[in-house]
Amino acid sequence: MDSGSVAAERPRRTPSRQRLPSSGCGVPARPGVSTLPGGRSWLRPRGRAARASPLLFLLLVPSPRLAATATATAPRRTLAERSRPGLVLPAAALGAGRNALGRLRLGARRVAALASSRRELSLSAKCHQLEHRKENLPLSVSRQLYFDTHALVCLLEANGFTIQQAEIIVSALVKITETNMNIIYKDMVSKMQQEIALQQVLSKIANVKKDMVILEKSEFSALRAENEKIKLELHQLKQQVMDEVTKVRTDTKLNFNLEKSRVKELYSLNEKKMLELRTEIVSLHAQQDRALTQTDRKIETEVAGLKTMLEAHKLDTIKYLAGSVFTCLTVALGFYRLWI
């Protein structure tokens, strides 16, 4: 129940209704509750303080001792004096009104905390309701009164309120309690309904257990047999795979050993061939060295023979040249003597 719904349900004020003076209570306004001016506007709920108003009654109504002392000390005013506009309230009435307002504001603070805790409780209770709601409650439950309205009206009149103001306040409190109790009945369940829901849940659990036993006897046995068959097949396949793997391993080992022996034989043959080739190469190198030494010796002998022949031819040519030169000189001298 929010402030909008309360404002919509509030009856309209007649023009003849008088307001209390603004200085009647002498208390500054607070954000949760407005002051006395405006008649019943000080009971206008704001925010979360409108929901948990059942505690508001206990905080609003003063104790019997305070009420007795207030009524004993304050003189009783007549109806004509109450209906006069602009009449100042007596000091006892003002004190009682201030006490009621102080209790109301203190209750507003407590109500905010209680509203938040009640909201958390309702949210946690919704998970365990199991779809049992309170729509089928009798109307007498939601329409019954939870406090003495006549005594509260009399108490408000004794504290300085008019009859109309007291009736409006009591009607607003009755509506607030009805809406809060309806919200509580919608959010919560009774102990009997909780026991019924618990019995239903237990019966459903028993049915599920029976179904599980039946499934274990019928379907689970078949599933177990199928699982055993599958396990046997898997074991056989595993054995076959292991046999194949061992065969492949032995074949590969044999092939590897054969190839290894063949490679070793080829390596030995290649080594032998390499040794033979090396011996042949060494022999060829020796033959080449021998042939080279023989040719070198032959060349040296030929060169020495040619040198000796050249020396001999040199001497012969020198002899012939010397003889030819002397002959020419002798002929020239002979001709020279002849001419002279």
Swiss-Prot record:
The modification N6-acetyllysine is found at K204. InterPro entries: CCDC90-like (IPR024461). Keywords: Acetylation, Calcium, Calcium transport, Coiled coil, Ion transport, Membrane, Mitochondrion, Mitochondrion inner membrane, Transmembrane, Transmembrane helix, Transport. GO terms for molecular function: protein-containing complex binding; protein-macromolecule adaptor activity. Residues 75-316 are mitochondrial matrix. It holds the Pfam family CCDC90-like. The keyword Cytoplasm does not apply. It is found in: Mitochondrion inner membrane. Interacts (via coiled coil regions) with MCU; the interaction is direct. Interacts with SMDT1/EMRE; the interaction is direct. Interacts with PPIF. Key regulator of mitochondrial calcium uniporter (MCU) required for calcium entry into mitochondrion. Plays a direct role in uniporter-mediated calcium uptake via a direct interaction with MCU. Probably involved in the assembly of the membrane components of the uniporter complex (uniplex). This is Mitochondrial calcium uniporter regulator 1. It comes from Mus musculus. The gene is Mcur1.
